[in-house]
Amino acid sequence: MPLLLDLHPDHYPLEGFRRKQLLEWVFVQGVGTFDAMTNLPAGLRAELESEYQLNPFRDIETVRSHDGSVKYLFTLNDGRQMEAVYMPYLDRKTICVSTMVGCPARCAFCATGKMGFGRNLTPGEIVGQVLAVAGGEGISPREIRNLVFMGMGEALLNYENSMAAARVLLHPDALGMSKRRVTLSTVGIAKGIRRLAEEDDLGIKLAISLHAPDEETRQQIIPTGAANSIEEIMAAARDYQAVTGRRVTMEYTMLRGVNDHLWQAELLADRLDGLVSHVNLIPMNPWDGSDFVSSSEEQIQAFYDALQDRGVDVSVRRSRGKDAGAACGQLALRRPGARTGEVGAA
C-alpha cells in the first residue's frame, strides 16, 4: 500500500477544499490516522484508509537528555530502524533527520558508520520523522522551524528522495519551512554538490563534512573519501557558490592527535582561500567502541585561534544530547533508558 507522505503535496488525493483539509490534518495538526480527520466524511476517511498508508513507523522510542534534546528511535514498517534528534532552543525548535538506515560513508569516528548501510529512506519516511517528533513533543509540526539533514546516512547518495522530502518541507501547503532554515550535510559527494546547486526551486543551505585538510588523514578517517579528493570537493564547493551565491559551511570534528595539528589548521585555511565559508569545529562526542577521543579544550582553542588569525570565519559547536547518545556522531540505535511512545500522536 503506498505511503501518503511519499507524495508531493500538489499530488495529494482529493480536490479543492477537501484536499486543503487533508493537508492541514497531516501537516498542521499532525494526526497519525485517517480516522482522526473528523471534518472529513466517514466514507472518505474509509476510502483513504483503504488506499493509503499514513504512518511510516511501526513503533517509536525516545531517550531524553538533561539539556532537553530528545533522541527518537523509529522502527519502520519493514522492521528496520533509524533515528532522529529533536533539539529545542529558547528561540527555535530544530530537528536532525536521517536519510538512510545506517550509512555507506563509514566515517571511522562516527557510530553510524560502524553500522554499515541498510537502505535508503523514502521521502515520506524522511518527512514522517518531523511529524512524529512533533507529535511526541505535543506541538504542531509547523512549530519546528529549523531542520538539518545530518542524521543517519548520506543525503546526496539518496538524492532523489532527499530532494523530494526537502520540497515537502518547504511547500506552503505542507510544513512551509524557510529554505534558509534547512541545511543539507554531505561527506563531500562532488557530483551531488553540483547537482544541488542547480535545484533552483530549493535554495537550502549546504554543509560539507570535511574533517581533514590533507588526503592522508581524510582517507584514514573517511574510507569512502577517496572517491572524491579534497581538491574535487573544494572545486565543487566553489562551483556551488558561483551558481547559488550562498556561503558553504565546513564541518570539522576535532580528533586528538589525528586532525588537530596546527599545520592542519594552516592547510585548512589555504584550502578555504577565496571561498565564502564558515568552519564549525566539533569536539568529538564519545561512543562505546570508538578508537578516537576528542581533542583537548586547549588544542581546540589553539586550532580555532590559528584559523581566526588567517581570517577564517570559525566557531566551536557544542553538541547537545550527549548523555542520550543523540549528539553528532553518536546515532547507532542505542537506547539506554528508552521509553516507548505513541507514534503520530496529535
Swiss-Prot record:
SUPFAM superfamilies xref list: Radical SAM enzymes (SSF102114)
Annotated compartments: Cytoplasm
InterPro entries for the chain: Aldolase_TIM, Methyltransferase_A, RlmN_N, RNA_MTrfase_RlmN, rRNA_lsu_MTrfase_RlmN/Cfr, rSAM
Molecular-function GO terms, alphabetical: 4 iron, 4 sulfur cluster binding; metal ion binding; rRNA (adenine(2503)-C2-)-methyltransferase activity; rRNA binding; tRNA (adenine(37)-C2)-methyltransferase activity; tRNA binding
The organism's place on the tree of life at top rank: Bacteria
Disulfide-linked positions: C96-C328
Record keyword Cytoplasm present: yes
Reactions catalysed: adenosine(2503) in 23S rRNA + 2 reduced [2Fe-2S]-[ferredoxin] + 2 S-adenosyl-L-methionine = 2-methyladenosine(2503) in 23S rRNA + 5'-deoxyadenosine + L-methionine + 2 oxidized [2Fe-2S]-[ferredoxin] + S-adenosyl-L-homocysteine; adenosine(37) in tRNA + 2 reduced [2Fe-2S]-[ferredoxin] + 2 S-adenosyl-L-methionine = 2-methyladenosine(37) in tRNA + 5'-deoxyadenosine + L-methionine + 2 oxidized [2Fe-2S]-[ferredoxin] + S-adenosyl-L-homocysteine
Extra information: Reaction proceeds by a ping-pong mechanism involving intermediate methylation of a conserved cysteine residue.
Name listed for the protein in its UniProt record: Probable dual-specificity RNA methyltransferase RlmN
Organism the protein comes from: Deinococcus radiodurans (strain ATCC 13939 / DSM 20539 / JCM 16871 / CCUG 27074 / LMG 4051 / NBRC 15346 / NCIMB 9279 / VKM B-1422 / R1)
